[in-house]
C-alpha cells in the first residue's frame, strides 16, 4: 500500500530553482517524480541558467537503445539513488516507481547505486532509421543516415536540459554513402566514408555559432586513399583513416599525410575515445589500452584487476571520455537467470599518469545500470554538459 503524499508548504519557484541548481543533475530524474511542478522545474531552461551562473554544470551520460527492429530508438540517462542503503525499501514512497521497472539481482561487483532511466521526451518522434550522433555542450546532434532507403541531409539535435528535439538547417548536399560526424572547435564535420567516396563532396561542416554550412576542401589526389573507414579529432586536428591516413588542419586549412604519431591500426569510434590528449581503446585482447605517441605503441591501462571481464565481441562495448575519466559500458547475459534478458554494465574509471609509459585506472563505481530483453540493440552512448 502506497503512503499518502506529503503536504508541503508552498515554496516560491525562485527559491526552489536556487535549491535545485545546487543538487547534482544525477538526482533530477528522481526529483521529477515528486510532482508535476517539480517535473516542470527540473526541465526548465531557467534552472540550467542558474546552474551555469553558480558554476554547477556537470557531465551527464545518455544511452540510446532500440528495443526491436520496428520500434523507435529510446534514450536513457544515468540516475543515482538518493540513498546509500544496501537494502532500499521499494515501497517507501514517491521515488519507488523509478526503480521497480529496472530492478535486478545484485551481484558482488555492483554497488547498485547507479541506473539508467528513460528520458521523458515531449516531441522526440523519430521514424525507424539508423542514427549517428555527436555531442556539443548540452546538445546531442543526430543525423538520419537512412530515410526510406536513401541517405538524408536532415540534421536534428536533442536539448538535454529540456529533452526536446529541434531541427537545424539541412546540409547543402546530401551524402551518397555512409558517413561519420565529428565536432572540432565549435563546428560539426560530416564526412563521407566507405569505398570510393565522392571527394568533390567529402566533408561539410556546420558552424554552431552562425548556424550555417560550409564546404571543406578535400585532400589532393596524391595523398588521398580509395576508402575511409574511421575518423578522429585529436590535438585540434581531424584525422581520416583508411588505406591511407590523412589529417586536416583547420587553422591552416590544409591536408597532410599522417606520420607515425598516430597508431597504424584504428578502432571504431564507439570503442575508442580521447581523454586529455591520450587515445584510449578496447580491442580483441579484451582489455583497455592507451596509445603512447612517444613510443608509438599501445600499452595496457593498469590497475583494473577488479573490473569485471568484458565481452569478446567489441560491438557489445562502448567507450567514452567523461570529465577527464573513461567510462566503459557493456552488455552481459544474465547468468543462470532468464535467457531472454541481458544486463547493461557501466564503470567509471579515474586516470592517473604515473610515468611516461604507465597510466593507471581506478574504478570509481561499477554497476548494473539496466536489465533489458536480449533482442534490444545498443546504439549510442554519449556525454553532455548541463
Swiss-Prot record:
PANTHER family assigned: F-BOX/KELCH-REPEAT PROTEIN SKIP4 (PTHR24414), GALACTOSE OXIDASE_KELCH REPEAT SUPERFAMILY PROTEIN (PTHR24414:SF82)
Judging by the UniProt lineage, the source's domain of life is: Eukaryota
Kelch repeats, residue ranges: 187-236, 238-285, 287-324
Signal peptide limits: none
User: Matching InterPro entries, A to Z?
Assistant: F-box/kelch-repeat_ARATH (IPR050354), F-box_dom (IPR001810), Kelch-typ_b-propeller (IPR015915)
Record key words, sorted:
Kelch repeat, Repeat
Q: Name one Pfam family in it.
A: F-box
Q: Which residues form the F-box domain?
A: 5-51
Q: Which Gene3D superfamilies match?
A: Kelch-type beta propeller
- Which protein are we looking at? Putative F-box/kelch-repeat protein At4g11750
